[in-house]
Amino acid sequence: DFSNKFYATPLALVARKGTQLLPQAEALKGKRIGVQRGTVADNFASRFWADQGVEVVRYARQEEAYLDLEAGRIDASWLDALMADGGFLSTPAGVDFAMMGGLIHGRNADEKAVIGEGVGIAIRKQDKDLKAKLDQALAEIRANGKYDEIRKKYFAYDIYGD
């Protein structure tokens, strides 16, 4: 079993600064968007963008997408925001790039079904009391502001979602 979520990894569109791209099919029509094969970002782009005129370019490793992004062979990369922020965007190679158009936790039920509900703490099924205590503690720190206080030390954006 799992506790209620304590974070949900949003997706982010990373592109060269000054680019006016948004993580929406209509805004990306005719663009080449890089994704790591087999990831949530790949599943999302395949389901919601590929048949809307967005060219989804798949890579075995995210680092390959970054190289093509730097070289201008793709217009943007679509990936886990935590990976973008803690990886490429925090390196010298990423200085001219940024997350564009906000983070996506899932704007509707279909998108949320692809992105997922978030990450909870794994608990043995028989530990129902422990699950209840963890769920209560998570709710309390969300309600009293401690969660956001801790989150702001490490992330400049919402990692919880709805």
Located regions from the model:
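Proline/Glycine/Serine-rich low-complexity intrinsically disordered segments
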Residues: D1-D162
